[in-house]
A protein has these predicted regions:
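NUDIX/MutT-family hydrolases
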Residues: 53, 161-184
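Short, solvent-exposed loop/turn elements at beta->coil junctions and helix N-caps
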Residues: 22-23, 132-137
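Conserved Nudix-box catalytic region and its N-terminal flanking loop in Nudix hydrolases
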Residues: 2-3, 51-53, 58-63, 67-115, ...
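Active-site-adjacent beta-strand/loop module that shapes the phosphate/pyrophosphate-binding cleft
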Residues: 36-41, 137-156
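Acidic, metal-coordinating catalytic segment for phosphate/diphosphate chemistry
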Residues: 22-58, 64, 73
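Extreme N-terminal tail/first-helix region
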Residues: 1-26
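Short aromatic/basic micro-patch
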Residues: 84, 147, 171
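A short coil-to-beta-strand element that immediately follows conserved catalytic motifs
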Residues: 17, 124-131
Length: 184
């Protein structure tokens, strides 16, 4: 049998054992770690870098005419202005600042989605549905993205952006959104 070819292994037999962890940066925004792990076959791998950040919400919002509400903003990581759905961090009520939180309550996530939609776009909705919750980057991060749909959004205010947010609201017809998605 080849190494790593047992796809029917039990989850316990696939788990890595943490040998050591050093917190390289730990502040209100991120916990960046360097760790050593023992693999299921007994071999040791190091360094393995990982991080914790806050869970966040992404809102697939559409207005009363069926247009999608998006925001355009500069993203430092890729050095580009992007068009994306409104999104933002979940302010946790359990005292933790970030990380590992499939424990975040559905109410906390929905409250964050409502808050972020209003802050970033000035829009609100009475028609919300939870789409899914997924790991943001399961290879190296322990936070989750909670995706919501907000339908029939209506503008009730201007933007109320955080001091580090500089973004513009754009509305995109469904056909234009499909073209953007096809382009990646």
């Amino acid at each position: 049998m080849e190494k790593n070819s047992n796809i029917k292994a039990s989850p316990d037999s696939l788990a890595w054992e943490e040998i050591s962890t050093e917190h390289i940066v730990q502040d209100e925004w991120i916990d960046f770690r360097r760790s050593a792990y023992r693999f299921p076959d007994g071999s040791v791998f190091e360094p393995f870098y990982s991080y914790s950040r806050r869970d966040y919400v992404v809102i697939v919002a559409s207005d009363t005419e069926g247009n999608y509400l998006c925001v355009r903003q500069f993203r430092q990581g890729i050095q580009k202005v992007t068009t994306e759905f409104p999104a933002g961090g979940i302010e946790r009520k359990d005292g933790k600042e970030y990380g590992g939180s499939q424990e975040v309550s559905a109410e906390d996530a929905l409250a964050a989605a409502r808050r972020e939609l209003l802050e970033e776009t000035g829009y609100v909705s009475d028609e919300w549905s939870h789409l899914l919750t997924v790991p943001s980057n399961a290879t190296i991060a322990d936070n989750y993205a909670h995706l919501f749909a907000a339908r029939n959004c209506r503008q009730v205010a201007g933007q109320a952006l955080d001091e580090t947010e500089f973004l513009n609201v754009v509305t995109l017809p469904a056909q234009e959104m499909e073209v953007l998605i096809a382009k990646g």
